[in-house]
């Protein structure tokens, strides 16, 4: 990597963030596309967020990525939001357009890009969970023309989830159906009608647990996806594959959300196949 007086910076901002794989992805991409850039990880306190955002302009950076807990906190410091960032209410990418700071959320786009030969337009989706990742998938699905969405959360989270879905309906006219995850007969009924089943919860990170009971039967044509990539094969994915269904983990989402951000910053396509190779070797 060449560093000189013309090198432009990009960074991922979060707390904690030192474990992040984003520098690996983006620095590979800068190198492969002969872009004079460098990507670093900044672990900051909340009190430093305004100053950090000001530094994007000050140092003429490409921009930044954001992770927890700053995806929502950053919004007041930006000049403009993209449609999906406004719907989600969270930003994971800030682009410096000649001193104008524009907030995007590339998580949902990254998720749908990583699904092999699948488009969500006109399809039905069952989504488990309603946290940050789920919201980005929800909003992107609506923007991309999904026909029906059933969201399942634990019954204790129903009340907390409803206002966001009401706000989505207000902004888009699209009604999302909400159910309790404990209602197994409803879960089975919705899954049978679905083209896509997504686990957007953290259940399965321990390598032991699954968000759905094994007694659930999957329909003939369904794609199953998990946003988790460590472990590489969660019990949820193992269960789907045991029923002969195509199933993808969350590593592709991580790569393709980064590719979307890279294109917004540089105008260049990230060489995803090359980087995917390195990532799978690292995590498999």
UniProtKB/Swiss-Prot annotation:
It comes from Streptococcus pneumoniae (strain ATCC 700669 / Spain 23F-1). One of its GO terms (biological process) is aromatic amino acid family biosynthetic process. It is an enzyme of class 1 (oxidoreductase). PANTHER family: BIFUNCTIONAL 3-DEHYDROQUINATE DEHYDRATASE_SHIKIMATE DEHYDROGENASE, CHLOROPLASTIC, SHIKIMATE DEHYDROGENASE. Belongs to the shikimate dehydrogenase family. It catalyses: shikimate + NADP(+) = 3-dehydroshikimate + NADPH + H(+). NCBIfam families: aroE, PRK00258.2-4. This is Shikimate dehydrogenase (NADP(+)). SUPFAM superfamilies: Aminoacid dehydrogenase-like, N-terminal domain, NAD(P)-binding Rossmann-fold domains. Pathway: Metabolic intermediate biosynthesis; chorismate biosynthesis; chorismate from D-erythrose 4-phosphate and phosphoenolpyruvate: step 4/7. CDD domains: NAD_bind_Shikimate_DH (cd01065). Homodimer. HAMAP family: Shikimate_DH_AroE. GO terms for molecular function: NADP binding; shikimate 3-dehydrogenase (NADP+) activity. Shikimate binds at residues 20-22, 67, 92, 107, 229. Its EC number is 1.1.1.25. The active site is at 71 (proton acceptor). Involved in the biosynthesis of the chorismate, which leads to the biosynthesis of aromatic amino acids. Catalyzes the reversible NADPH linked reduction of 3-dehydroshikimate (DHSA) to yield shikimate (SA). InterPro entries: Aminoacid_DH-like_N_sf, NAD(P)-bd_dom_sf, SDH_C, Shikimate_DH, Shikimate_DH-bd_N, Shikimate_DH_fam. It comes from the Bacteria.
């Amino acid at each position: 990597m060449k560093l000189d007086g013309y090198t432009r910076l990009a960074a991922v901002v979060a707390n904690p963030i030192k474990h992040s794989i984003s520098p690996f992805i983006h620095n590979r991409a800068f190198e492969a596309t002969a872009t004079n850039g460098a990507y670093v990880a900044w672990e900051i306190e909340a009190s430093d967020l305004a100053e950090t955002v000001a530094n994007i302009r000050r140092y003429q950076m490409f921009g930044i990525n954001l992770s927890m807990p700053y995806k929502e906190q950053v919004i007041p410091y930006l000049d403009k939001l993209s449609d999906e960032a406004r719907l989600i209410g969270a930003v994971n990418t800030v682009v410096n357009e000649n001193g104008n700071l524009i907030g995007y959320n590339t998580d949902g786009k990254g998720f749908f890009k990583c699904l092999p030969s699948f488009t969500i337009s006109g399809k039905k989706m069952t989504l488990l969970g309603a946290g940050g990742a789920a919201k980005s998938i929800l909003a992107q699905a609506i923007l991309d023309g999904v026909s029906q969405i059933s969201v399942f959360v634990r019954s204790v989270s129903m009340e907390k989830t409803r206002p966001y879905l009401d706000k989505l309906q207000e902004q888009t006219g699209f009604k999302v159906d909400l159910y309790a995850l404990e209602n197994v007969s409803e879960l089975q009924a919705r899954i049978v009608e679905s083209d896509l089943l997504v686990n957007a919860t953290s259940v399965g990170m321990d390598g032991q647990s699954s968000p759905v009971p094994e007694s659930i039967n999957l329909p003939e044509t369904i794609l199953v996806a998990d946003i988790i990539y460590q472990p590489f094969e969660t019990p949820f994915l193992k269960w789907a594959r045991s029923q002969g269904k195509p199933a993808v983990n969350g590593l592709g989402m991580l790569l393709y959300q980064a590719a979307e951000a890279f294109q917004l910053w540089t105008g260049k396509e990230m060489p995803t196949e090359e980087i995917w190779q390195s990532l799978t070797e690292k995590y498999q």
